[in-house]
A protein has these predicted regions:
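Active-site phosphate/pyrophosphate-binding segments
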Residues: 14-21, 28, 36-49, 152, ...
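Membrane-targeting and insertion segments and their boundary/processing signals
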Residues: 3-7, 44, 82-85, 207-210
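Short, flexible loop segments at the rims of nucleotide/cofactor-binding pockets, characterized by
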Residues: 29-33, 73-77, 100-102, 197-202
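Pocket-edge structural micro-motifs
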Residues: 31-33, 55, 82, 224
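Glycine-rich phosphate-binding loops that contact phosphosugars or nucleotide phosphates
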Residues: 45-191
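Residue-level detector of alpha-helical secondary structure
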Residues: 21-24, 28-31, 65-69, 114
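Generic N-terminal amphipathic, Lys/Arg-enriched alpha-helix
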Residues: 1-25
Length: 224
């Protein structure tokens, strides 16, 4: 048996449950869609002139992907702030998305304070703590998610919440074309490739496992 076909051995090594979170990406996306379907966004948010997403590490990864996928389609500029400070141009016509999986990231909380000072529009993406309390107290739009399908609890493995959730909200605000059709299509594609390239697909029929075997004991270089 190929090692990559030995499920029990892989799970024994995977103490952090990374595999379970990878396999649950479609479930994360489905949960985000279900949670946000009936959510409405303030009309004023759709009229902003620019968007800044404040987040660190995996909490900002969803915005990075959206920027790469939709940069040519969005009618307003999108910038990601991986820092304690927002860009100097942020004002009342800016949408500031505060993205922190934990809800207590100090850089993101610093950006929250700055966004409040300039009366920027604020949207919150978090699973709890300080940002969740602020969202509830101020009745702000956004996504307060319970990551049921991210057992490893790593922000970058919860993209179904941070990335897909932000896609849905941006679609509701009219920044991108993303509604039920696009959401369900994306979920089906994820499920398709999970079946084709997932851990339960045998090495002989699994291109991902075959590539992993070829890369064993090698150092890959990526250019893009």
């Amino acid at each position: 048996m190929f090692f990559l076909d030995n499920i029990s051995q892989i799970k024994n090594l995977d103490k952090g449950q990374m595999l379970a979170s990878i396999e649950a990406l479609a479930d994360q996306c489905h949960e985000a869609w279900k949670d946000l379907t009936g959510v409405s966004v303030l009309r004023a948010y759709s009229k902003v002139k620019n968007i800044v997403v404040a987040g660190m590490g995996g909490s900002a990864l969803g915005a990075d992907i959206i920027d790469a996928l939709y940069s040519g389609e969005m009618e307003v500029s999108l910038e990601i702030a991986n820092d304690y400070h927002l860009p100097a141009y942020v004002n009342k016509d800016t949408l500031v998305v505060l993205s922190s999986y934990s809800g207590s990231t100090e850089e993101t909380l610093s950006c929250l304070a700055e966004a409040k000072k300039v009366d920027a529009k604020i949207l919150v993406m978090t699973a709890g703590k300080d940002l969740a309390k602020f969202k509830k107290d101020k009745k702000l739009p956004g996504y307060l998610f319970a990551p049921h399908f991210n057992p490893c609890n790593s922000p970058r493995m919860g993209l179904g919440y941070s990335f897909f959730g932000l896609l849905i909200l941006f679609g509701k605000m009219g920044f991108i074309k993303f509604g039920e059709f696009e959401a369900q299509k994306a979920i089906k594609v994820i499920e398709k490739y999970n079946r084709a390239l997932g851990v339960y697909k045998k090495m002989t029929e699994n291109r991902a496992k075959q590539l992993a075997e070829k890369m064993q004991n090698k150092i890959p270089f990526y250019f893009s």
